[in-house]
Amino acid sequence: MAAKEIIFSDVARAKLTEGVNILANAVKVTLGPKGRNVVLERSFGAPVVTKDGVSVAKEIELADKLQNIGAQLVKEVASRTSDAAGDGTTTATVLAQAIVREGQKYVAAGLNPLDLKRGIDKAVAAAVDELKKISRPTTTSKEIAQVATISANGEESIGQRIAEAIDRVGKEGVITVEDGKSLADELDVVEGLQFDRGYLSPYFINNPDKQIAEIESPYILLHDKKISNIRDLLPVLEQVAKSGRPLLIIAEDVEGEALATLVVNNIRGILKTVAVKAPGFGDRRKALLEDIAILTGGQVIAEETGLTLEKATLAELGQAKRIEVGKENTTVIDGAGDAKNIEARVKQIRVQIDEATSDYDREKLQERVAKLAGGVAVIKVGGATEIEVKEKKDRVDDALHATRAAVEEGIVPGGGVALIRVRQAIRELQGVNADQNAGIKIVLRALEEPLRQIVTNAGEEASVVVAKVAEGSGNFGYNAQTGVYGDLVESGVLDPTKVTRTALQNAASVAGLLLTTDATVFEAPKDAAPTAAPGGPGAGGPGFDF
């Protein structure tokens, strides 16, 4: 086991905070409509230019191990927020930095870190409740476009494209983003279906940038049982290999020898395959497999239909123009199924919806209709150079996630105003002791920070703007794009409630953990002897605990 170094108390927290600040300072310059770009070096190929907070955070690794631990903690804030809401990563980072900075002052003054954390948690819970009260649902295509525009750093064309895509495929439809071949953005809607199962092995990935497996013009094998014996699969694999096309296998499970053989053949380029588990469970799984079969023009290989794997031929396999398989989702684009059969299937499911007695069953049936009838919208991002397209794609992805979040939990005034308004709800909040009250004050100050940073990035004086916005009420705020005060909802500056809520909760969670840290253990440099660094129990000296 490698030797470890241990750093204690104030020394540890100070170093961790330095790491937090280095990462947060790099990320927060991207916040708001006038946020700046960050250039990321690549070990091969052109550098990447981005305004996406989580992309910047993921690139940062610091040489100082203790600073790096602090940076990684804030990186976790951005990653968690990205995973949960798809946007708001920069806001979450700014909030985390503010909570750590304000909290450190109180910890250094001798207040109890655990009570500070309890006060922070209490204030955040009250702030989230208030956010939900001021939130309202998105009702129009215009509002969806406005949310997308704000998330795309004020680019209206992106907002309009996403709103149009949602209009075409519905709120339950699937929208994907691709590189375009022209200077302008384009929107294509193709018939398709997405289900919540991903690849069974990461070795199937052939697009490392997106961490997905993409296959063009594949055959699709549908089976309702587990596949573990490769001999059962050999006849159909040989037929597919002769055709020169890839294969997607959707089965209850693919394991053991069968999965290992598919992976090896894939790596060697003998037969490009991807294996995923069938969606759903029990009877619902059978119904979903049948949906996929009808959409792709194939048949489910099942005992009930008298078909077996050993005797399966290409005629029983479905086909599609393209398949995208991620860690958690599979999208079938432009299946080769007959339009009349698909329409008949949709009608059949609609009858089941009318007859359904439980809300859960009705909801799941409606999802199936949306997937069969809605199709997949593909936004093709245009640009003059590959670097421009990649940067724009990041913003389209963020905007897409933001609109999904807005549909899910509603919207609040944007531009950092919603967080200023929730301060009024927690201003009178009291903890059980003075230290908890200090924790509440930390959150009160941190809630100003996103607005301060947006204004700073726009080149204005933050304190003046924050004071004026705080004097107002409701939707009154500062539009950093135009430099004008007014009703932000009317001027289309909106944020999804889910994004704002998730950013605040994740920032408080990780910042609270960092404030309550009193020792840090990390691997000692190879050329240094293991030591307990100054500041440990019993180590005298100014500024350290005794």
Curated annotation (Swiss-Prot):
GO-annotated cellular components: cytoplasm
Composition skew (Gly residues), residue ranges: 535-546
Keyword Membrane set for record: no
Region of interest (Disordered), residue spans: 527-546
Entry keyword annotation includes Cytoplasm: yes
Binding positions (ATP): 30-33, 51, 87-91, 415, 495
A Pfam family this chain is assigned to: Cpn60_TCP1
Catalytic activity: ATP + H2O + a folded polypeptide = ADP + phosphate + an unfolded polypeptide
GO molecular function: ATP binding; ATP-dependent protein folding chaperone; isomerase activity; unfolded protein binding
Main location: cytoplasm
Compartment(s): Cytoplasm
Enzyme Commission number: 5.6.1.7
InterPro entries assigned: Chaperonin_Cpn60_CS, Cpn60/GroEL, Cpn60/GroEL/TCP-1, GroEL-like_apical_dom_sf, GROEL-like_equatorial_sf, TCP-1-like_intermed_sf
Biological processes per GO annotation: protein refolding
Keyword entries, A-Z: ATP-binding, Chaperone, Cytoplasm, Isomerase, Nucleotide-binding
Domain of life: Bacteria
Subunit note: Forms a cylinder of 14 subunits composed of two heptameric rings stacked back-to-back. Interacts with the co-chaperonin GroES.
HAMAP family attached to this UniProt entry: CH60
Task of the protein: Together with its co-chaperonin GroES, plays an essential role in assisting protein folding. The GroEL-GroES system forms a nano-cage that allows encapsulation of the non-native substrate proteins and provides a physical environment optimized to promote and accelerate protein folding.
Family stated for the protein in its record: Belongs to the chaperonin (HSP60) family.
Name of the protein described by the UniProt record: Chaperonin GroEL 1
Annotated source species: Burkholderia lata (strain ATCC 17760 / DSM 23089 / LMG 22485 / NCIMB 9086 / R18194 / 383)
